[in-house]
Amino acid sequence: MPFSRRDFITSTLASSVAVGFSKDALAQESAENKQTTKRAAKLPIIICAANGYNYLNDAYAFLAGGGDTLDAALKVVQGPENDPNDESVGLGGHPNEEGVVELDACCMHGPTRTAGSVGGVRNIKNVSLLSNTVRRHTGHVMLVGEGAERFAVAQGFQRENLLTDKSRKEWLLWKETHSDWWGPGLDNPDWRQRYSGATHASEWDRRIQRMEQVAADIGIPPELRMDAIRCVIFPPTGTIHCSALNAKNEISGCTTTSGLAWKIPGRVGDSPIIGAGCYTDQDVGSAGATGNGEENIKVAGAHTIVENMRHGMSPLDAGMDALKRIVRNYNGDKERLQFVDMIYYILRKDGAYAAVSLWTGYEVNKPHQVAVHDGTRRLENAVSLYSGASQSWPPIRMLR
């Protein structure tokens, strides 16, 4: 349902107050993190990011019928990859700053203890399947860029234009009105020079009116303009991870993404990194991530979580520990952490599972969720370390 400029301003200011300008609120850990880890009612079980919810039924039926765990997980993530309306993966994914879609993916097959990965792939839609092809048909683990694309074509994958008209127009809107990735990052002492966000409704209104004018000139339909503006101001970091466990306690996982919207060409995030965006150990369990890839790489999040479980932590505690390592990298500085978010999806080989996030959600009243199917398909809220909504990096700046 389209939302108005007033709705956008109200929700944005609410997020700023909850995260950017209320240190007391920021310092409070979510009461939800006192919850306990949940356990599947029965095996098999599949867990994934919320954008995989619509694809769980077929994958679960396949898994329950004796299908391979990795094949089941791949069935889930192919759904968003094939959906042009899901702009976080595959076809229709948001492009880099030059308007080119670059995709990343990895997979791990627990029963055979093998892995495959691809990064910076152009013109190939189902990079999750491509990562599995690397796993099955090469002696390598990771292929990137042009080499990965050539390998895909040699293996029978079809080249296709992944940039939809909708994503192209959103990229044009970003190109004309917003910022780029050149300049200091959050871990640079000079990070503040990039932070001059608006905090008053009148300033937001001026900015958004200007962006609406540009959106109209570009040809974005009226009912889609506020959605496009949101994508520009808050660059999506969407991804999908999926882990699947069968009745024999065999487990596998995979992660696929189009990466951070408007990224510098060649940027590779955590999704294709074995041990960051995805990690599976047949003896322990599986974990994956969505959110700020750079921060997850620094803590090797998925590997950290699985190793925590190996040493006796519950899925919930293992995930919270990984989040706290991200917090430690910024010495607990909430002024910078407001620009970071991370969601971990965790499945232990006995069917215990959890989903944890650094912040409640990208909006205060819309918590991060995990999709689960153990005979009953459902969405559950992630357990957050901190209450409040995160913001995107780079921060909002004055429009040109």
Region annotations inferred by a language model:
Residues 22-27:
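Boundary at the C-terminal end of the N-terminal hydrophobic targeting segment
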Residues 3, 10-13, 17, 28-400:
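Alpha/propeptide regions of enzymes that mature by internal proteolysis
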